[in-house]
Amino acid sequence: MTHDHTPLALPSNRRTFLTRSGLSLGTVAMASLAARSARAAAPSNSSGLVGLPHFAPKAKRVIYLFQSGAPSQFESFEYKPRLNELHATELPDSVRMGQRLTGMTSGQASFPVARSKFAFHQHGGGGTWISELFPHIATQSDDLCVIRSMHTEAINHDPAITFFQTGSQLAGRPSMGAWIAYGLGSLNDNLPSFLVMISRGTGRAAGQPLYDRLWGSGPLPSQYQGVKLRASSEPILYLANPAGCPPQIRRQMLDDLRGLNQQSLERLHDPEIATRIEQYELAFRMQTAVPDLMEFSDEPEHVLAMYGPEVNKPGTYARNCLLARRLAERDVRFIQLYHMGWDQHDNLPDHMSKQAKDVDQPSAALIADLKQRGLLDDTLIIWGGEFGRTVYCQGTLTNETYGRDHHPRSFSIFMAGGGIKGGMTYGATDDYGYNIVEGPMHVNDLHATVLHCLGIDHERLTIPFQGLDLRLSGVEQRRVVSEILS
């Protein structure tokens, strides 16, 4: 196989650098940045790698609604009517086939099948089966592609989340947003190309930790890592000028600092110095762009109502979905939401009902809002967690409650928007929802398909690192799932 390698070499001159640079703040302190001023010419960071996109894209940007903790497919998008008659019977060994279990259930003496407590109904022209827990998402079914045959090798949360976010279970690889920002560049000179928001669910108090490396850039230049938007009066740290410092003075100090950094760059040829220069300049421009982003007074009441009652509370999933739409309007390339709290090992009916209420209306509103603004056609949306849940009960099964363990062999997600066929389902599992029987889609197949929607050949977006040609879709043979493409 021939790969189209693009080295991480420093641009040969200042003009090239300024037209190709992007930015991420990461953990760099920026307490001394200056205010916006007419003196500051905003350098363009719009250009990505030469030759990208490889072909005409269907999508310009991605919104990834990651449901951290792994929502159960049996209570969301995987309708298995036979589970009603199989309820409380033992999961046959012929179905499990000795497959690996977690330490939480491997010692159980019994593996009773647990039916879903919630009803399913068909929706839209495609007759998509969706749980009663998600009535608002169901209204968007004609725009959804529900994938019921996702699978992964990872059985524990952190490696499984890392796998979805970076294409590898090993920590330290570039995240999906970093790869896309690196390859395609930014569409907005005044905001980072990759922004991250985190919300906590109401269904479970404790959630899996989310480490900053999940939106990191790995061996790519640090300008491509994600920037976290916080739910506070200071959404991005260290953008404001120190109290009592006139903007003109801060601008002059920034110019002087740029000159010193430029001298160091010319002497040392360290790409991270170039990144630092652009970090300061973008942060300078963000002093105006971020307050404008966070100003919701221009949102009509009927739009706020679409997202539900939590939309006015900073840090909620609803608020973050509205922010995602505002970022899409501003052409941010990759918008990552994490919603924590889906790890329902016990008391699943109660916990999952609360989690679903957190995300159902805002997720549906985001899709509908993008569509009414003409943005859905070129915005790719992904909704799902890191693996699925077992058909058998973890712990004691009763008529009122049950829990489900981790299940990497098969689970469901949905996609919508740019490049994706709506109103369809893809893949199928057996009667127990345990093994895939049709259309398997690996995590790295998802990555290959996402890149394809953005006009990128996943086999050609690579970097050489420690003897490997790293790519988001991994080093094994993977495929674009053309069956779900519009």
Predicted feature descriptions by range:
Residues M1-S486:
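Ligand-binding pockets and gating/stacking loops
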